[in-house]
Amino acid sequence: MDGPAFVLADALTKLQEDDLDIEDEVLVDAQDAQTQLAAVTRVVDAVAHSCTAVQDAATFTYAQSCIKYVGHLEPDTAHRLLDAILSGFSGLLDELADTDATATSALAEPLERYAFLLQWLIQLLEKHRDTFARPKTSARGARTDGAWSWAASLPTVLGVLAKALRTVSERLWSSAAMRDTFVSRCILRPVMLLQENEAYLKVAPVKLGLFKVTCLAVKLHGQAFNVQTSIMQSLQYYEHLAEPMAELLSVLRVEFDVARLGEDVLRELAAKSFTGLDSKSPRSYGRFLVRMAELNPHSVLKQISLLQKHQDSESYPMRNAMIEVQGLLIKSLALHPDLGATDVPADGDDDTPAHRKQIDAFFERLLERFLDVTTFVRTRAVQVCNGLCDLPAAFPAQRLRMTELAVQALEDKSSHVRRHAILLLVKLILTHPYGALYGGELSMDAWSERHAAVQSRLEQAEAVLTRPLTDEEGTAEADVSQSDLAPPAMSSADQEQLVQLRLTHTYCTDALKFMTCLERGVPILVQLLASTNKAEVLASMEFFRVAYEYKIHGAIDGVRAMIHLIWTKDLSLIHI
């Protein structure tokens, strides 16, 4: 016998307000285990006989009663109940897929009943997850055969939810509001509830299932706004969701070709303001930004002009995040020059490639943070620069500036900043771009000789172009045509040689500047060998070891100063 008409929105509202009245409710919580199993079996048999049995008043009553008191059921009994709902829902979806479009509206109500039951069951199983979390064990600790855990069923549950989103369409309902209620409250809401549990996101099938359901809701059912709201709330209240939300948006862009939602989230985040008293939410938003820059740099580049305000945020976690974001964008642009070419307006007077302009701007903002008021931010800026030294691109001007700032940071009041500045100097030496022509050594004397030789050759080559007129040539100038006064045209080989000499001269000049900066830091590093901070001393020793190998002037002074430290260290190891 069919029951009264079922209105999904009303049932969900009553359930939310704890005012749901189940007609002829069965008090399953007062029954023994065998009677409870019989009640669930009645639902299982009815659904197995017909997927539309959920429209039968008695079957629907038993299903609701069993779900309401699922926390009182044995794990295996609860498992049977879940399987019955999933089986009936999946079977009805198969029937819907094979039904003519003109007759599908008749299946709307049973689908809504299944969706209502399933979202309620998910909510309560999650509430009582500790009861259904671990398989039963025997007295000896061995696992009992056939035991069930709620977490193990999640991939199947999410698979059915995804199937529902792929199968249903707007033709099922007479209004968009009814479809929105079905999708947002019966499909998306359980997914949002499940993702609040950090443990589930560590299980790949569950995590991918959550992402798939959310992406299908956005792609096929216009749930972008609801998902955007959910993401912002997740970042606000659940710190563990920072990276997963960025990964979700990446999956949505790559696998479902929907990039706009990620950009909308970034715009909303850019409009937020944080104070120095905020601690949790800026850290979560910052981690989200960093992960977005890793997975979706193009979207971040498009919104970077808005996000840039957080560079000067009162909250240091946001400043830290922007430093990492800029480092990641530099890396992305260096490896993929066409990534942001369309986002920079063309300048007719400047033929510098668009991606180089962006890289220069990001480096400028990044290096500014070496002087930040917060120790953590200064340290992060040095660390990011350290990572950028591994890029194949040379960035000679930025490397020189890094070296200057790293030497200045050797006198920072924070030992953390000093230690990372030393590590940056070591990395700058190990990855320096001045080994292509003359080998990797950085001897000031040798490079000065090379620079002088190149400069002499360059002056001789340029003298031909800039040779001044003699007095006799000046007197006869009026009688000679302008074309006759012009210097003789250079051959292509001479032009190529002149260009090569100029490049080599710049190359040698930059190398000398680099070595000069390093040598200015040597006396400070000698003093740091006497630091009380062990990590700082070890970093200084590593610097002098590397500097000595590269023949940097003054490195021998550091090596001599640290000999007693090596001896002390060896003795301490012997005593241990």
Cite the ranges covered by each PLM segment:
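HEAT/HEAT-like alpha-solenoid repeats
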Residues: 226-230, 260-270, 298-311, 336-369, ...
